């Protein structure tokens, strides 16, 4: 029996190093190839030895798909392709292709140049890896080979993020990557059609969360920032370079303008310019409001937000700083945090999810004494706030997407086990869909049924059986019945019943051909000549001369008309249905040869 096999190499009951191996109808696809931000050893990368035991990666894998540019989804890609060894195609969207190498290089600099880590990929490896990338457009069906095809859908989340449908014959899997079902200030909501895959693999980061009103969260965020700077404190907002950063910058920019505030706002050097460049380049990926106003005003060119210099961190007085990365695991955000953590007037606002092992996760879990590098202990006196501006779907959004796609089964990844368990039960009870949540290295096998049960109406069955007993008709019947699909159930009914159920009127499509004849007689006389001629030739057909002057041969209609510009010429209009195309073509050819001379 056909089956789909899924093995998470990363993100199984876990957030970080997303990497899911899918086998579908004899094809093997790797979905994402991320790194875990909470580890600095071999655990940061997925365990690729699971694949390589039986030979070369390229021989086993048909393709790799990257859903978006976040490092927990693409961070291990150069290691995988250049160090482990994979030469096959890597698919991603155009914005992901543009932004991915920049973030990989930024992270490489932190890991190798600053921390001196060994066994890490080089700048050249990033370039060589990106040469294997095939960029895809949204809703474009891409043939990976003769049997395997993939298609990208808009996922929201970050610029260029996509959900992917993987299809082989009648079997299909949809992988969501990270997505957001709520539009925000710069991106639209995720969308997928009713594609009814055998399996939907969905993220479950916020599996138990139902978010409050976005407007309340924004108001709360602005209030906390404003109160902190009013009392002379500094606000650190750790973000990733693209995504929540732009969302919160637009929010603060508007508030600063409205309140006429003079407190400086800074953003990590260089990244603002890069972000601006890519949002301009890929403006079709943003939401409708930004696309409409972009010609008059670029929402990403900020009047109040300036580039940050590391010397500014020691300046007296209030300020707001957006610094990367978003989980306080390295880089500029961690450096600033260490400087400001000891002052209770200051505040750090964590706007997104932090994986276990990162400083961000530790302070959100309540730790206030942190062991840093070199066994230094950092005491955190600054206020710590968590405000979810995360661009992940909440429980309501995940349920909405499952309902939209109508899969046969659901598999949860990219989430914590306890939260997954809650969502698994919710999906199974409310949507009556089987749901799985494998751990890393655990394989889920799903049998797929290539047959679809179809109900048939008794009336149609009786009619077809009676038709089968009759001698073969001259003309083949083009339509025996109509397949109706409703609520995932299929029924075969007669075409008359289908029209009645759907409230549709029957239409007939006819083809008309013009035949020119030289004839000075009146139209009625020409039609009579046509009737006599055809009656004498077509002994086995029903030829009739109707009261209105037209001629019929079976269902074929022939009418004579006189063009006003040439009274000596008559035009015969020969029309037929698709069913009688053969007879219609024959009559047209016959009439084009002309009519026999009538006795004078």
Curated annotation (Swiss-Prot):
It comes from the Eukaryota. GO terms for molecular function: RNA endonuclease activity. There is a cross-link at residues 381, 462, 475 (Glycyl lysine isopeptide (Lys-Gly) (interchain with G-Cter in SUMO)). Sumoylated; sumoylation regulates its subcellular location and is required for integrator complex integrity. Zn(2+) 2 binds at residues 72-73, 178, 414. The RNA endonuclease activity is inhibited by BRAT1 that forms hyrogen bond and hydrophobic interactions with the active site. Zn(2+) 1 binds at residues 68, 70, 157, 178. A motif (Nuclear localization signal) lies at residues 469-479. It is an enzyme of class 3 (hydrolase). Its main location: nucleus. Pfam families: Beta-Casp, IntS11_C, Lactamase_B_6, RMMBL. Keywords: Cytoplasm, Hydrolase, Isopeptide bond, Metal-binding, Nucleus, Ubl conjugation, Zinc. Signal peptide: none annotated. One of its GO terms (cellular component) is cytoplasm. One of its GO terms (biological process) is RNA polymerase II transcription initiation surveillance. A motif (HXHXDH motif) lies at residues 68-73. It is found in: Nucleus; Cytoplasm. Component of the Integrator complex, composed of core subunits INTS1, INTS2, INTS3, INTS4, INTS5, INTS6, INTS7, INTS8, INTS9/RC74, INTS10, INTS11/CPSF3L, INTS12, INTS13, INTS14 and INTS15. The core complex associates with protein phosphatase 2A subunits PPP2CA and PPP2R1A, to form the Integrator-PP2A (INTAC) complex. INTS11 is part of the RNA endonuclease subcomplex, composed of INTS4, INTS9, INTS11 and inositol hexakisphosphate (InsP6). Interacts with WDR73; interaction is required for the assembly of the RNA endonuclease subcomplex in the cytoplasm. PANTHER family: CLEAVAGE AND POLYADENYLATION SPECIFICITY FACTOR FAMILY MEMBER (PTHR11203), INTEGRATOR COMPLEX SUBUNIT 11 (PTHR11203:SF37). RNA endonuclease component of the integrator complex, a multiprotein complex that terminates RNA polymerase II (Pol II) transcription in the promoter-proximal region of genes. Belongs to the metallo-beta-lactamase superfamily. RNA-metabolizing metallo-beta-lactamase-like family. INTS11 subfamily. This is Integrator complex subunit 11.
């Amino acid at each position: 029996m056909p089956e789909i096999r899924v093995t998470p190499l990363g993100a199984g009951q876990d957030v970080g190093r997303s990497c899911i191996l899918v086998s579908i109808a004899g094809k093997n696809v790797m979905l994402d190839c991320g790194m875990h931000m909470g580890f600095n050893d071999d655990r940061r990368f997925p365990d690729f030895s699971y694949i390589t035991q039986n030979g070369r990666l390229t021989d086993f894998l048909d393709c790799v798909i990257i859903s978006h540019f976040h490092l927990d989804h693409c961070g291990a890609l150069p290691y995988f392709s250049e160090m482990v060894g994979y030469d096959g195609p890597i698919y991603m969207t155009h914005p992901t292709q543009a932004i991915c190498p920049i973030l990989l290089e930024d992270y490489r600099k932190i890991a190798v140049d600053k921390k001196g880590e060994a066994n890490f990929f080089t700048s050249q490896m990033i370039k060589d890896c990106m040469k294997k990338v095939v960029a895809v457009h949204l809703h474009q069906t891409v043939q990976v080979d003769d049997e395997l095809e993939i298609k990208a859908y808009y996922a929201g989340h970050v610029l260029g993020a996509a959900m992917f449908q993987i299809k082989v014959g009648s079997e299909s899997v949809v992988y969501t990557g990270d997505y957001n079902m709520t539009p925000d200030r710069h991106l639209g909501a995720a969308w997928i059609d009713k594609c009814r895959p055998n399996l939907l693999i969905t993220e479950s980061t916020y599996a138990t969360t139902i978010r409050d009103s976005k407007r309340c969260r924004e108001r709360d965020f602005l209030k906390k920032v404003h109160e902190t700077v009013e009392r002379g404190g500094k606000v650190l907002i750790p973000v990733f370079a693209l995504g929540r950063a732009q969302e919160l910058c637009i929010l603060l920019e508007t508030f600063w303008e409205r309140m006429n505030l003079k407190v400086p706002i800074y953003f990590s050097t260089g990244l603002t310019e890069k972000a601006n460049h890519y949002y301009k380049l890929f403006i079709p990926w943003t939401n409708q409001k930004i696309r409409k106003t972009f010609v008059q005003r670029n929402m990403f060119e900020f009047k109040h937000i300036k580039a940050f210099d590391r010397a500014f961190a020691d300046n007296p007085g209030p300020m707001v700083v957006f610094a990367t990365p978003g989980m306080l695991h390295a880089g500029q955000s961690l450096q600033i945090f260490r400087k400001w953590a000891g002052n209770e007037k200051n505040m750090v606002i964590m706007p997104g999810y932090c994986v276990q092992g990162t400083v961000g996760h530790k302070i959100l879990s309540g730790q206030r004494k942190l062991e840093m590098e070199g066994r230094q202990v950092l005491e955190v006196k600054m206020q710590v706030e968590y405000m979810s501006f995360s661009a992940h779907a909440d429980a309501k959004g995940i349920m909405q997407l499952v309902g939209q796609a109508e899969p046969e089964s659901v598999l949860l990844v990219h989430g914590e086990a306890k939260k997954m368990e809650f969502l698994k039960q919710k999906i199974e009870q409310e949507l009556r869909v089987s749901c799985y949540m494998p751990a890393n290295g655990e394989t889920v096998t799903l049998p797929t049924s290539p047959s679809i049960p179809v109900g048939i109406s008794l009336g149609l069955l009786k009619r077809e059986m009676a038709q089968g007993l009759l001698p073969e008709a001259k003309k083949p019947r083009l339509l025996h019945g109509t397949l109706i699909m409703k609520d995932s159930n299929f029924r075969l009914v007669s075409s008359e019943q289908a029209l009645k159920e759907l409230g549709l009127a029957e239409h007939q499509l006819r083809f008309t051909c013009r035949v020119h004849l030289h004839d000075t007689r009146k139209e009625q006389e020409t039609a009579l000549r046509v009737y006599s001629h055809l009656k004498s030739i077509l002994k086995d057909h029903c030829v009739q001369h109707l009261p209105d002057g037209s001629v019929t041969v079976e269902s074929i209609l022939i009418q004579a008309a006189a063009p006003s510009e040439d009274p000596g010429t008559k035009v015969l209009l020969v029309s037929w249905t698709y069913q009688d195309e053969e007879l219609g073509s024959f009559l047209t050819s016959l009439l084009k040869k002309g009519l026999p001379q009538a006795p004078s």
